[in-house]
From Swiss-Prot:
Bias kind Basic and acidic residues: ranges: 189-203
GO biological process: cytoplasmic microtubule organization; meiotic cell cycle; microtubule nucleation; mitotic cell cycle; spindle assembly
Gene this protein is translated from: TUBGCP5
Keyword Protein biosynthesis: no
Protein task: Component of the gamma-tubulin ring complex (gTuRC) which mediates microtubule nucleation. The gTuRC regulates the minus-end nucleation of alpha-beta tubulin heterodimers that grow into microtubule protafilaments, a critical step in centrosome duplication and spindle formation.
Organism: Homo sapiens (Human)
Record keywords: Cytoplasm, Cytoskeleton, Microtubule
Subunit description: Component of the gamma-tubulin ring complex (gTuRC) consisting of TUBGCP2, TUBGCP3, TUBGCP4, TUBGCP5 and TUBGCP6 and gamma-tubulin TUBG1 or TUBG2. TUBGCP2, TUBGCP3, TUBGCP4, TUBGCP5 and TUBGCP6 assemble in a 5:5:2:1:1 stoichiometry; each is associated with a gamma-tubulin, thereby arranging 14 gamma-tubulins in a helical manner. Gamma-tubulin at the first position is blocked by TUBGCP3 at the last position, allowing 13 protafilaments to grow into a microtubule.
Name listed for the protein in its UniProt record: Gamma-tubulin complex component 5
Length: 1024
């Protein structure tokens, strides 16, 4: 069924035809009566009428255009960037055929369509095609001839010959001699510009030959570059003839003097070539570039200067031109980095053609490039003054005006030579980047020490450093904020070890490597960042100091901790809401570099706002100076010293000290004398107040978040408590059930080394009170040396308790930590074994074993037995009594040792450890606290090799206790008086030795924690 038209027939016929043509072109349907054609037509009209797309956003389009422009600049496509910028601006500022306004929605809609159709504009090659604008056709109709058609005029005999033909031919003949003689205005002299503007000027009369010649003489530069010898023009001014007078003097003083052929130039020409040289132009006449060195042509002379004087001035300028060429060469190489280019100072060894300069060199190049832009603008202003001829400009005036710039060029060349050119070609990028940043940093500090005389130089170096340090700060920001250490060129001093994944237990120790260079050997070394971060301020021997990026030294530990913490946080499974909130915060976040610049600017503004305060401070300082001067004079007069200058200096010194204390007493450093001197006088304070606080804040945030996550989501504190409960036996009831079952087996002389039996006993004991830890605990037994097995105290050697710690808690509770825990666990087990063996002995057992022989003899031999046992009854009782006393002494010793370790060492140290864990700011600090805690209990339990003799004495006493318990259990009949006496003697010697050693240690004050043990053992010795 055919339709006659759309329901909204108010639309004009032109749109109707366009839509139908669109359907034919896209769908390929030609018959309008076709139902498919009508469906497509209705669909098209519906989308036009009720479209779903938004109106164009002009701000978004301009932001996209600016982003593409910056991308072209970053990719060093400067020609594409310039074309893109110019063409888009021309289009936006040009009216459309049906719209007279500019920058309308139609303009931005067309640009939006083109941007949507574009595909990676930075990767496509583009050469701008010249666009010839249509020029309005001039009216060639000869109105004069038409109007004067019937008039009779005497035109002269040469009416057919144009009166300008001969001059035009002469002008055309001279044009090939023109040259590219300006670095600021390359292809056109001022004459040509003015001549183009005056082509249709009716005031120029070509018939009047003298006027034409004078005009040409005033506006066309004499071709001094043809190197033709010129005659000295004579002037009535004596100073203008100095060169001729000097030549005449030389000729009169030396009859054989023959003047060389020289080219006479004007001072203006010398000035302009000087400006062109400093702007980077290489093809000059007065200055020649030969084998990369700028030299001055020897035959140049001006009328008012001698040849030697002019040459000395120009040679100084040539030296600065050489600096400009060297720096410009570096800029071109970094921008282009073609296969033939080499970095300065690389000699004959070229760099790899595929390796682009790393970002620090690119940032340094960009800083130099921006400096030269402002420098060339200043040179262009001077040349405009010369062209306009408004003021008198001489070579001396130009050199004096450029003196600050020339001194800056000297400083830039020194920094460039030290930081870039003198670096060997095979040096790693990390060393190149750190060396360049250190060179700038040291140069700022060096010129900063000079004071106000070098404020401009320090300001220049500071701006250069701020631009050069941008990639480093961006790398730091990306790492400590997002957890990604992106460093493709490997120029950052910290490198990621990709072989260790994040979820590995060695991630915290072996993931990152800190590169440093020894100043003396210049050899690259690798240090683990764990060592550097854990050592804190300890830098090792003073003879071997390592250099790195100097400005990052105060916050290097915070950067490493924040970066590793953030990467660990990113890999932990956090809640989605937290991730969304972090993403929203990151969208509003400013980068570290931006925050640093804003802080510096606010510091500068604060210095500008404090100008009225400075005046009052100066007045107060003057008054204080007068007071202090009078006081100093009175003190000096007492010593018969009359020196007013010395008094003034003393007074000024006291004032500076008081001013220093006033500034730094409150902790808020504010040294803002002027806006210029803020960065000059206090560069390190500027870093301390503008950069370091932002790094510290991010360090506290991400490390605090990591600690909170580990404590709450991953139960770090609970796992630490579990290690103390089982390894240090703070879970007393649980571990008592476990080790008493083993001790009973040993007392009954039964086999107890079976691993299955040990694990069953451990699971039964732990499962009752700590069911969540029973699956993580296990115990194993390894056979020890047979020599140790002979001693009862070493029968427990080989027992090893294991606790499965999940990731990431195993970063804190590592396998090395569990080894230390096991050493303390074994010592506690040995002490408890001795204590248990003595505790279970009963007095009745020993008495009953003494009476058994009498009961066994029977009544038959009663008289003989009584006769024999009667005289021996008293020695047996004495033997029993001595064994009772020895048991009490051993129990006192073992109980004193047990109480000392369980209360004074483990419990007190554990309370300190819990408090330190709560206050730990980062994971590295927590690891150190845990290691320090283990080291403390390891030392205080006398397990260190240095005090092994004390431990041997204690082990000997424990061994005596176990042997005594075995003998007690065997019965009195197995004892002899000699063995009891020997055991008493051994115990007394060990007891005396330990008391003496411990008392000396306590008196020295080196081991205050041993005081309680020493007093307890002394009490036992007094009882004996």
């Amino acid at each position: 069924m055919a339709r006659h038209g759309p329901p909204w027939s108010r639309l004009d016929a032109q749109q109707e035809r366009d839509v139908r043509e669109l359907v034919r072109g896209v769908a390929g349907l030609q018959d309008e009566a076709d139902p498919n054609f009508q469906l497509a037509l209705n669909f098209a009209w519906s989308n036009f009428r009720f479209h779903r797309f938004l109106d164009v956003n002009s701000h978004k389009i301009e932001k996209t255009i600016e982003g593409i422009y910056e991308k072209f600049v970053i990719h060093s496509d400067l020609s594409k960037a310039a074309s893109w910028k110019r063409l888009t601006e021309e289009f936006l500022n040009a009216p459309l055929p049906s719209i007279k306004e500019i920058k309308t929605d139609a303009h931005y809609s067309i640009l939006s369509l083109l941007l949507c159709l574009s595909d990676s504009p930075s990767n496509s090659s583009y050469v701008e095609t010249p666009r010839n604008k249509e020029v309005e056709k001039k009216d060639d109709f000869d109105w004069g001839k038409y109007l004067m058609e019937d008039e009779e005029m005497d035109i002269g005999p040469y009416m057919d010959t144009p009166n300008w033909s001969e001059e035009s031919e002469e002008e055309n003949d001279q044009q090939p001699l023109s040259r590219e003689d300006s670095g600021i205005q390359v292809d056109r002299t001022p004459l040509e510009e003015q001549d183009q503007n005056r082509k249709l000027d009716p005031c120029i009369s070509w018939k009047d030959e003298p006027d034409d010649r004078s005009w040409l003489e005033h506006h066309v530069v004499h071709q001094y570059w043809t190197a033709r010898p010129s005659q000295f023009p004579h002037s009535l001014h004596l100073h203008s003839n100095l060169a001729a007078v000097w030549d005449q003097h030389l000729y009169s003083s030396d009859p054989l003097y023959v003047p060389d052929d020289r080219v006479l130039v004007t001072e203006t020409q010398v000035i302009r070539e000087t400006l062109w040289l400093l702007s980077g132009v290489k093809k000059l006449f007065i200055f020649q570039l030969i084998d990369g060195k700028v030299t001055v042509r020897n035959n140049i002379i001006v009328t008012h200067l001698t040849h030697s004087c002019l040459r000395s001035v120009l040679e100084q300028i040539a030296a600065y031109g050489q600096v400009v060429f060297r720096l410009q060469e570096f800029i071109d190489e970094v921008m282009g980095h073609s296969s033939e280019s080499m970095l300065p100072g690389s000699g004959s060894v070229p760099k790899k053609s595929t390796e682009a300069p790393f970002r620090t060199y690119q940032a340094f190049m960009w800083a130099l490039y921006k400096y030269f832009i402002s420098f060339k603008e200043e040179l262009a202003e001077i040349e405009k003054c010369i062209i306009n001829n408004d003021t008198t400009i001489t070579l001396a005036i130009v050199v004096d005006k450029l003196a600050p710039r020339l001194s800056q060029l000297k400083v830039l060349h020194k920094v460039f030579s030290t930081g870039v050119a003198e670096v060997p070609p095979d040096t790693r990028n990390v060393v190149r980047a750190s060396h360049l940043l250190n060179t700038l940093y040291k140069a700022i500090l060096e010129y900063d020490n000079v004071g106000e005389a070098s404020e401009q130089t320090v300001s220049l170096l500071f701006s250069l450093w701020v631009e050069t340090v941008r990639p480093y700060l961006q790398t730091v920001d990306e790492w400590i904020v997002h957890g990604h250490l992106w460093d493709g060129a490997r120029e950052f001093i910290i490198q990621r070890n990709k072989n260790v994944p994040v979820n590995h237990r060695d991630f915290w120790y072996a993931t990152y490597t800190l590169y440093s260079v020894s100043e003396k050997t210049e050899n690259e070394e690798k240090m683990s960042d764990n060592a550097s971060a854990s050592s804190g301020s300890d830098q090792g021997p003073s003879s071997r100091q390592h250099t790195m990026v100097s400005f990052l030294k105060p916050v290097l530990k915070q950067i490493i901790m924040a970066g590793k913490s953030m990467q660990l946080l990113k890999n932990l499974q956090c809640a989605e809401s937290t991730t969304c909130q972090a993403g929203a915060r990151d969208a509003e976040r400013k980068s570290l570099y931006t925050l640093f610049l804003e802080s510096v600017q606010s510091r500068l503004r604060h210095g500008e706002d404090s100008t009225p305060q400075v005046l009052t401070e100066q007045q107060a300082t003057k008054e204080n100076l007068m007071k202090m001067q009078s006081i100093a004079e009175s003190h000096l007069e007492l010593d018969d010293v009359h020196d007013p200058l010395l008094a003034i200096n003393f007074a000024r010194m006291y004032l500076e000290q008081s001013d220093f204390h006033e500034k730094f007493a409150g902790g808020d450093v504010c040294v803002d004398r002027s806006s210029e001197s803020v960065t000059c006088q206090t560069f390190e304070l500027t870093l301390r107040s503008c950069l370091y606080p932002h790094i510290d804040k991010q360090y506290l945030d991400c490390c605090g978040n990591l600690m909170q996550t580990l404590k709450k989501d991953y139960r770090l504190v609970e796992y630490l408590q579990a290690m103390r409960n089982f390894f240090l036996m703070e879970g007393g009831d649980t571990m008592y059930d476990f080790y008493t079952s083993i001790f009973d087996k040993i007392r009954e002389k039964e086999t107890w080394q079976n691993v299955s039996f040990l694990n069953v006993q451990l699971q039964e004991a732990v499962g009752q009170r700590y069911p969540e830890d029973s699956s993580r605990l296990s115990i194993s037994f390894e056979n020890v040396d047979t020599a140790k097995k002979k001693l009862p105290v070493h029968i427990l050697d080989g027992l090893t308790l294991s606790y499965k710690v999940p990731w990431p808690v195993d970063i804190v509770i590592s396998l090395e930590c569990q080894k230390i825990y096991n050493q303390v666990f074994l010592l506690l087990l040995q002490i408890k074994w001795a204590k248990y063996s003595l505790d279970v002995l009963l007095f009745g057992e020993l008495v009953s074993t003494a009476e058994k022989p009498r009961l066994k003899e029977g009544l038959i031999h009663e008289q003989d037995t009584v006769a024999q046992f009667g005289p021996q009854k008293e020695p047996v009782r004495q033997q029993i009594h001595r064994m009772f006393l020895l048991r009490v002494k051993l129990m006192h010793f073992v109980n004193s040792l047990h109480n000392y370790i369980m209360t004074r060492i483990l419990h007190s140290t554990g309370l300190e450890f819990q408090h330190q864990v709560e206050e730990a700011k980062d994971l590295d600090q927590l690891i150190k606290i845990h290691y320090r805690y283990l080291s403390t209990i390891h030392d205080r339990c006398l397990l260190r090799e240095k005090v092994s003799f004390v431990k041997e004495a204690i082990m000997k006493v424990l061994n005596l206790a176990l042997m005594f318990a075995d003998g007690w259990q065997a019965g009195l009949g197995t004892w002899r008086m000699e063995s009891i006496e020997k055991m008493e003697s051994d115990f007394k010697n060990c007891h005396m030795f330990l008391v003496t050693i411990l008392n000396k240690a306590v008196c020295r004050g080196s081991f205050p924690h041993l005081e309680s043990l020493a007093l307890s053992l002394m009490a036992g010795m007094e009882q004996s």
